[in-house]
Regions:
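Alpha4 helix (beta4-alpha4-beta5 surface) of REC/receiver domains from two-component response regulators
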Residues: 63, 84-102, 114
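Receiver (REC) domain active-site loop signature in two-component systems and cognate sites
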Residues: 56
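Hydrophobic/aromatic residues positioned on beta-strands within the core alpha/beta folds
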Residues: 80-82
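Active-site residues of response regulator receiver
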Residues: 9, 53
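C-terminal output helix
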Residues: 104-116
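Helix N-cap/capping motif at the beta->alpha junctions
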Residues: 30-39, 61
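Two-component/phosphorelay signaling modules centered on CheY-like receiver
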Residues: 12-30, 97
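Short amphipathic alpha-helix used as the core "switch/output" element in two-component signaling
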Residues: 39, 62-74
């Protein structure tokens, strides 16, 4: 069975491309922004891997992933950014274990796939809670 992966982005075209390119390898769930991601997690339980864009309206990807990680430490978080700056503390987030990886956009589908597979391997068999307590941003 394919592993569940939640992708969060505020651009529909990016989400459609992810579903098209990675939908055969993973059980892909799409969220159009952080609020929808939280709603999905509250309804479906936590995901083994969450991939989020950095720059989104209202709540940025780093804040979203930090919130997810606080409630479910076993979730592997990957951040996509089209900006080279780490003003949000990207290096510290990697060192602290908050993020598994930061990838630059545009990210080739194969590189994203390999990174997700590596995150799943690094998770070392720890399954996230199927239904963690509800939380909000």
């Amino acid at each position: 069975m394919n592993e569940r992966v939640l992708f969060v982005d505020d651009e529909e075209s990016i989400l459609r491309g992810i579903k098209l390119n990675l939908g055969r390898t993973f059980d892909v769930t799409l969220a159009n922004g952080p609020e929808e991601a939280i709603n999905i997690i509250n309804e479906q339980g936590c995901f083994p891997v969450v991939v989020s864009d950095m720059r989104m309206p209202k709540v940025d990807g780093a804040t979203l992933l930090r919130t997810i990680k606080q409630h479910n430490p076993e979730t592997m978080c990957i951040l996509l950014t089209g900006h080279a700056d780490f003003e949000f503390g990207g290096a510290e987030a990697l060192q602290s274990g908050l993020l598994f990886k930061i990838l630059n956009k545009p990210c080739p589908p194969e590189k994203l796939k390999v990174t997700i597979l590596a995150a799943l391997e690094a998770r070392d068999g720890k399954a996230p809670d199927e239904k963690a307590p509800d939380f909000v941003l």
